[in-house]
Amino acid sequence: TIVMSATYRQSSRMDAAAVERDPENVLLSRGPRFRLSAEMIRDQALAVSGLLSDKMYGPSVQPLRPNLGLKAAFGGSTDWKTSPGEDRFRRGIYTSWRRSMPYPSMAAFDAPSRNVCTIRRGRTNTPLQALVTLNDPVYVEAAQALARRIVAEGGTSTNERALYGFRLV
């Protein structure tokens, strides 16, 4: 399994010989030193699946998110209408953010609250983060698109598709 592989179990400690042979870590000679930020995790899932929009600039977008069905004290809903077309798959930095109702998947991955200036982000590792990647509508849609992409582009045999999927991810 992947978790038991030598590459997965590597330390993030820098070995001088490995750094000399593989300074950019292309050959995966060491583990990552930290996990990606909240926005980058979402962007990576969309990029691998082929859904990430490369559209730059413009107003904030409202990507797909779970409906919470809550009503604010003065009649406003906490749910939003998902942006149409490719806007729903734009990079995380374009996501609309309300301090009173942050984007749930990014909040789970320690995105700043925007209440105060954040110089350094904390990084946690919680079971909730795993549940977000399994159940959040954006990640489910990205997983489905990745599966369709592997079937369409990965060849005809199961082995070819598995190898193609491994190389994509």
Write out the residue ranges for each language-model feature.
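Short, functionally critical alpha-helical segments immediately adjacent to catalytic or ligand/cofactor-binding
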Residues: 1-4
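An acidic, gly/pro-interrupted, aromatic-rich
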Residues: 6-164, 168
